[in-house]
Amino acid sequence: MNNQKQQKPTLTGQRFKTRKRDEKERFDPSQFQESIVQGLNQTGTDLEAVAKFLDASGAKLDYRRYAETLFDILVAGGMLAPGGTLSDDLTRTEYCLFTASEDLETMQAYAQVFNKLIRRYKYLEKGFEEEIKKLLLFLKGFTESERNKLAMLTGILLANGNISASILNSLFNENLVKEGVSAAFAVKLFKSWINEKDINSVAASLRKVGMDNRLMELFPANKRSCEHFSKYFTDAGLKELSDFARNQQSIGARKELQKELQEQMSRGETLKDIIAYVREEMKKTSISEQTMIGIVWTSVMSSVEWNKKEELVTEQAIKHLKQYSPLLKAFTSQGLSELTLLLKIQEYCYDNIHFMKAFQKIVVLLYKADVLSEEVILKWYTEGHVAKGKSVFLEQMKKFVEWLKNAEEESESEEEEGD
């Protein structure tokens, strides 16, 4: 038996090509860099020509693969090494964002270059946002002038919706915050952003990505107070941003207060202790009685699981509110607070459809408990109500209001007879 393996025939003169999809192209940005730098050197400071060059080059150069290189060159003139310094290679251009004039008009023109480029090549959007995040982390490696230009550009890009406000997360980097770089950068950024839009637009963008309550993080922990934030940005000419942050902190404090109140009620703490706690919080946070009664009402109504059946929920509400009427009474010492409470009740009964028929019974209960006065109820009925469910609630209150008016007239006539 021949144990030797039989040799298989071979094909000669045949070359097998690797399929294109199996080829692994080497990452080498140097040729790409040379092409971009050469083009920018030719276009110079003419940003219209720069935009046209970038538009045309996208058809010949691999923007998708070398997006970071492209953006590094447009911003800093060459490829950036970690930390924000330019790489040692000599392929760089003097025509970039960092060498441009430090004024808003020039930065607006640069923003247009980026805007046109990203609109033309939509796939660059994500890479551009990542580039901005990276540049913000490199701020310490840039000069003050370079930071100012980048801040102005970023503000304009945020205003135009080219990038998301989530990029601000990079500014909360501990080292940048500790050295005051983040706060100084934020001043320039928000000035250019508000210059393009307004504080309401800025606020909406911040809320969208959950940044509205994080602005205090631009400062180190020992300076992270509303007072410090307010003074810093007001002195820098950004009072509207200071007011916004103060308002956000106030909203945050109210939410925390409401949460704590609900927990105290769930734990079954005494009304005396709850009232003392609320009064202490009013002193600490300077919350007015009108604002506080709204918080108390919401907490009272959120501290219980309501029956889904309309016919049972009214009875449940009356029982619950009877228990907490002393708490409501403690924070309705003024007519304006009473009216605020009455409007809150109207809105609540309208927004929660099972309570639509309970409105009148709730008002009567609180009248009997000396929480709501007849003057305030009559004022609400004639002119003080809001539009929500107006016709339904006015109809419900009609007989009780007539009774109040008659009682008032009888009382007046008795006084006259007594005189």
Curated annotation (Swiss-Prot):
InterPro entries: ARM-type_fold, eIF5-mimic_regulator, W2_BZW1/2, W2_domain. Translation initiation regulator which may repress repeat-associated non-AUG (RAN) initiated translation probably by acting as a competitive inhibitor of eukaryotic translation initiation factor 5 (EIF5) function. Enhances histone H4 gene transcription but does not seem to bind DNA directly. One of its GO terms (cellular component) is cytoplasm. This is eIF5-mimic protein 2-A. Residues 1-29 are annotated as: Disordered. GO terms for biological process: regulation of translational initiation. Residues 247-414 form the W2 domain. Keywords: Activator, Transcription, Transcription regulation, Translation regulation. The gene is bzw1a.
